[in-house]
Amino acid sequence: MGRANGKRRNHRKNRMNPIQKKGFLEQEIPLNNSEAALPLLSRLDNPEIKERSWACSAISNIIASCTEGRLYLLKNGLVSKLIDRISDDSVEVVVEATGALRNLAIEEGYSICMDMYRKNVLAPLQIWQTKIVQTLDEATEGKNVLETYEDRSTFSCLCAIAENISSLLVNLGETTSQVIKVLNQKNTLVFLSRLLIPEAKIPQSVQEMALQAFFTLTDDNDDGIITWIQNSSDFALKTINQIYLYFSYPSCLVRVYSIGIIYNIYQSGFVNKKMESVVKGISLFDSFIPEALPILSDLLPSEENYRNLVRQVYDKDTYFKTKKDDLTLSSELLVIPATLELISSMTSLLQSLADGTDELEEQEDSLMEDEDLSYMDDMSNVVNEDENLIIDEIPSNTPQKGNFKLVEYMLDHVLPKVITYCVVAFEFSSEEIPSNLSNYFQEVGDRTIECLNNISWSCNSVFVESSEAFTRWKLSAGKILQWIFQTIFLRLGLGVWPFSSEGFTTACSLLWSVSKPFPAEIQVLSVDDISTLILFSSTHGSLEAQSRLLGAFGSLGRCGNIQINQLLGQTLMSCVIASDPNPLLAVEALNAIFDVYGDKSYPYDAPVFKGSGYLSQLSEALPRLKNMVKKIDRRREKHLRFRAEEALENLESFIDYKHAEYAS
């Protein structure tokens, strides 16, 4: 479908990293001199605890503050030396060593995380996980009341280690499925769940990080969830109940990660047969999405509040005076992309349920949205692709009835907020801003487009034209269509797309979805808008983006502007009559042609379709298209082969139909 799916592992690209944990040193060593950092490595083996602890802390500070120094240390065996220090006899040294590894994983990402994994970082970490769980169990059972200063100090250090380990697990969990498999085998979710029980009196910062790690490690990890529940059934259910209570927690990060964890478990019940009975057996899941959506909506600020949140952490004059590389983003800012991600995933699941479609079956072929073939009612021998049912004809206990109100809520409460976020980001585009703020704006932009896209497709899927909600959706779709060309597509003519390449693909899908409700009334676009978009897509867009754009042309082409129709018609035909047509593009172009030129009464049919000789060109292209279909591997590309065969069958009927239509 045109919607962006929930991306069940791996990975949600550009997800914001957890906040860094810098060491206690700021400028005790010259950060601009990488060679000055090298002696710190030898001090990691110093017999004095204070020396080892100081060295770890200093290295942690270099990792977070000095790129040159960090790379210099990495070239000299930093990772192995820090992993060795996790087994240090001193808990204070372990705190600093795990903190340094935490910063290193954040700064260097995938490559260093995989290096840590290959160097067996999980082995010493698991030893500490066992110690932490044992201490927490003793505390909750009253066996360790932390009466002495030493006990409280040790407990504080263990909490710091737990936070650092949780942060490392977040980053390791974003690497590969193999790493996830090993983490499952080591019962990592059991460890994280122990950090969430309030009786343990864990600091909030540790809980936030543990929740984020739990969220990451339950994302598309059905095996891990099943193992966790099977190995600790009663405690797992207790944890789920506790996570539900966190929905009303004061911390916005606690709320969003708690909802994310429950969503991951909830979703598993629909896509994994082994989890289905587990989810159905937990009554709290019955009203999960209706309860979670308003909470998530409240976490999304208004346009003005969003602007103020950015200004609170970034002041241009102050920033250039301090000359810091990065800003510390507030929790209120960090929660926005996570919230958008969750709403997008929930919306995708709701649409899958409404369509009666298993989300897993759509992962590889998510481009296709059911086509409107109502114009071909007289063509009885054409394969009808539109098999969507009308809500009023469905029993009240079907997903469509239950999802109507949820999608309506998103239309009224989520969409108006989300559409403003890119505008705020563009206000800072002319300024020289810190790199992490720039990355943040890009992620929020990508998440915004994805969220708008999924809500839009759900509105198309759930609302019927006779409903008042569809009328509101139609108005909103028109505004989004204008917004697309006036904001995110504004600088395409200069070759500038402000977000990721995946974001552009999703934007093309969004254009497709919002053009569907009112194809005959589109008056907001110009020939320049369309030609610029076509040129940019052909030079910068992926095949997936181009195919979604062709899908959009199936609606945009039905506007009353003959010049626009002529431009779109040329583009669609070029994909079909090519000497060696690309099947993905050809199939989508054919379906759009059926939509646009299905009736000779359309004002553009005679001057464009008939006048340009498209009918004869389609007839001439038939042999090449048949050969194209035969080349599609039925085993590797089953869905594409099916759609291509269907489009080819429809084309033959369409050609006969148009000949008969013109002869009448």
UniProtKB/Swiss-Prot annotation:
Its main location: cytoplasm. The keyword Cytoplasm applies. It comes from the Eukaryota. It holds the Pfam family Arm. Forms a heterotrimeric complex with rpl5 and rpl11a or rpl11b; interaction of this complex with kap104 allows the nuclear import of the heterotrimer. Component of a hexameric 5S RNP precursor complex; this complex acts as a precursor for ribosome assembly. Belongs to the nuclear import and ribosome assembly adapter family. It comes from Schizosaccharomyces pombe (strain 972 / ATCC 24843). Gene3D superfamilies: Leucine-rich Repeat Variant. This is Armadillo repeat protein involved in nucleocytoplasmic transport Syo2. It is found in: Cytoplasm; Nucleus. One of its GO terms (cellular component) is cytosol. ARM repeats lie at residues 77-119. InterPro entries: ARM-like, ARM-type_fold, Armadillo, Nuclear_Import_Ribosome_Adapt. Keywords: Cytoplasm, Nucleus, Protein transport, Ribosome biogenesis, Transport. SUPFAM superfamilies: ARM repeat. GO terms for molecular function: unfolded protein binding. Nuclear import adapter that specifically recruits the two functionally and topologically linked ribosomal proteins rpl5 and rpl11 (encoded by rpl11a and rpl11b). Guarantees that this cargo pair remains bound together from the time of synthesis in the cytoplasm until delivery to the nascent 5S rRNA in the nucleus. One of its GO terms (biological process) is protein import into nucleus. CDD domains: Syo1_like (cd13394).
